[in-house]
Amino acid sequence: MNAPLISITRSGSDISVASPFHPAFVRRAKELGGKWDAAAKVWTFDARDEDDVRALCCEVYGTDGSPVKLVDVRITYRHAASGDRSAIYSCGREIARAWGRDSGAKLGEGVKLVEGRVRSGGSAKNWETVIDAGSVLVLRDVPEPIALRRVCDKEDRLVEILPSAAATVDVPALQAEREKLVARMAEIDAILSTQTASAA
């Protein structure tokens, strides 16, 4: 299990972002003028807004697709948590989802229930995803930047980063980043070569 896959690609005057669904990302993407491409399943933005788009990805997911240290996070729910007709999110990912009052609830990818229960509830019309009070969940491979921002000891929940022995480095992401950099260097060399030839 690796961190949620975030991919930012430039094509002409646009950039596209492929990322897992997150309501906070959707809301801010629209504010940045992003458009959802249903066929390609990506958000598209004006390439001039790339810095803002990357900042948004880091804010919501903890990474813009660049290699990042991953850690495991433990969340202890002192009070019940619920999502009104929606999933429950934390640390940039979906951690539990119901689909209706009687559907039951399913854990998100890379999430382990250590203690307690996740379930569906509410009414047929206003159903909920519910994490019961006293439940303990472990989220695997969370980007460290967002994990550090979520660490807290509050009345309703305790969020902790597990010991570093559980931390991993996202090797595939590092390899992918290296390939991108090598390709980009080749592009730059080609541009410089063309410019040098033109100047001569």
Segments the model singles out, each with a brief description of its role:
Residues 1-200:
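Accessory DNA-engaging acidic/polar modules
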